[in-house]
Amino acid sequence: VSDYEISFKINTIAPMRICYHFLPKMAERGFGRIVKTTSGITLDPQQAGYSASKAALDKVTIDLGSKYEGTDVMINITDPGWCRTDLGGPHAPNAPESAIPGIVVGAFVDDKKSGRYLNAPFFTGMTLEDAVAKAERDFDSPYPKNE
């Protein structure tokens, strides 16, 4: 149980506190970007606490994003993919730096849509301009369209 507690404190509670601190200030200014890093780890019982904490982070991000949908305060999630890190191990197919375009793209999209789940490997090798265009075109917000 302690691994769940630690994972939730680090991966869910701490980012929530940061969001609840900064989001009102961003809303007052009329601009802000938050990009949270999630994980696609599944079916790994040894990582269950970690995976559950990231799933909770995803849910909180989508819920908070709905509050700011249509504004210039945007909250998105990015999954860096399986990278060669301490967690990913030496046999992971991706170098950590390969995830950079897919991580930073969430800070540069400008279409007032929050709650996107951006999969960093889809942006590998792209210029920032191309990555932003792809994110705005191919990664939609999870909220219903107001038409």
Model-found features: residue ranges?
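Substrate-binding pocket helix/loop in short-chain dehydrogenase/reductase
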Residues: 3-5
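Catalytic tyrosine of NAD(P)H-dependent dehydrogenase/reductases that use a Tyr as the general acid/base
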Residues: 7, 16, 50
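Active-site helix of classical SDR
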Residues: 19, 53
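Active-site-adjacent segment of SDR/Rossmann-fold oxidoreductases
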Residues: 26, 44-45, 63-73
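Residue(s) in the substrate-gating loop at a strand-loop-helix junction
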Residues: 39
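Active-site loop immediately N-terminal to the catalytic Tyr-X3-Lys motif
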Residues: 44-49, 91
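C-terminal helical subdomain
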Residues: 73, 77-78, 85-147
